[in-house]
Structures are given as C-alpha cells and as structure tokens.
Amino acid sequence: MLSIIACISKVHRAIGYKNRLLYAIPSDMTRFRMLTTGHTIIMGRKTFESLPNGALPNRRNIVISKTREQITGCEVYTSLEEALAARKEEVGNKKASDECFIIGGASIYEQALPFADKLYLTIVEKEPEHADTFFPEINPAEWEVTEKEMRNENGLPFTFLTLYRRQ
C-alpha cells in the first residue's frame, strides 16, 4: 500500500518555506512518528537535507535524487518508479512491510499521488505568512474520508484526515 503523509494549509495547500516545514505541531509529529515507524519512507533529496538529524530511525529511508551519491542510513534511487520497484520486490520477498509512506517534498508528492492508495493529511486552518512549496491538488471525487479528528494546539486549529482512494 502506498500512502502519502503531509501537513498542509487548508486553502493554498502550503507545505514549506525555504526547505523548512511551516508548522511545528507536537501531536502532528507524534502522529507522523507512530504511523511511519517500522515502515519504508520515500522522500526527495531536499526533504532529506531538511531533516535535522539525517535518516529517520526505525524506518527504511529511501531518497530520490538525480545523482546516486551515497547517503548514510539511506538507499538512493534516481526516480520514484525505481524506488517503488525495489520496494515491491522486497515486499514480495517479505523483507519489507506492506505500507510505504511518501513524506515529501512537493515534486515527489506530485509524482506519487496518482499511485497512492491512502492519504494521511493534517489540514491547518491558518495560512502561513510565507510559503514556496505546495501540496498537489486533490480531486475530492477520487478520495473518501474515513477518519476525521479536529484539534487545537496552542491556539492553532487543525484536522487530522485519513482518506482512501475510491475504487
């Protein structure tokens, strides 16, 4: 199963500014960690470079990069298709868990969205002052909301959504 996980602003679907996340929401970070631990995560090179401590622990880290330059704690592939093929082979050999998470950035989200089975979104009500990176548009007719939890942390309202692709 291919899942996408992201924290986005409600109106413009903003996800970042200058290679940094827009929102630091503790429960969103906890949700991310709980969902992705023990699974494969796929990200672009810039997303990897934005991680403060490098590869995320207790996950299979895959980085998509135009170069095959080695990255400590990660597997590197030159395309999303190549990474998904390698992962599919490992799932078939029972060497990897079934669920795989796309964790960013914008280009990888856009490439993966047509293949995704599930979306885990945190929708933040407040638009950021600045943003230069955006999540692709989602066609609501293609997705069914299966879980919705409204929250408010430190005066910031947001919603956890889980969506499955309609058959």
What kind of feature is each model-predicted range?
Residues 1-167:
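Enzymes that bind and transform nitrogen-containing heteroaromatic metabolites
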